[in-house]
Amino acid sequence: MTSNREAVMAGNMIRVTSRDGFELDAWHVKPAGPRKGGVIVIQEIFGLSDHIRKMAERFGAAGFEAIAPSMYDRAEPGFIVQPRDVAAGMARGVALATGNGPDNALNDMGGVFDMLKAAGKVCITGYCYGGTMSWLAAARLDGLSAASCYYGGNIAQMLGLRPQCPTICHFGAKDAHIPLVGAVDRIEAAHPDVPVYIYDAGHGFARKDSTDHDAASDRLAFERTLELFGRAG
């Protein structure tokens, strides 16, 4: 279910000091060309997987310095669910996400923010669990320039949190986990100033190793994210 983190891609592993002093691993990608800013990339429930590393590298290729922290390191360092083990690993991933809690997550995301902010603006994005954490950060992590939240299943449970930076959300119309009626519509009603984009796709449409991957939706959501991050102050 888990694997060692092998440096097989364009980035490298670094250590990040959380705001409460805890040290965690993170995948770091330098920008290609002139630096446009920093991006915090928050994982799904499956850990700091190859998919999340590749998403960080995607932002690096677009000119951003990207850091993807390993959000479960406090409880189970190195936890990664491989694509073939998604069904078996999902329950453990959910348990780790729940056990980590919002305060630990904010401290860890804050530590990454502190690493990136010296060189300019910092934006955040995340997927599934990371989409919810990106919403949390947009509301409670001071100084962020923008947030792009992908299919965050628990955003609808955090409607009292108001993003303090420009924020957009992405959801799939065919997402069996996040219904348009009863979840997404509640987000739209509570936060009419937050653009909510609906795609003809399922949950995890940006994950290339998922059966729900939808290339057109993935591409459009990424373009919208880059546009937001590019104009953010």
Q: Model-derived features: where do they sit?
A:
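N-terminal cap/leader regions of alpha/beta-hydrolase-fold enzymes
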Residues: 1-233
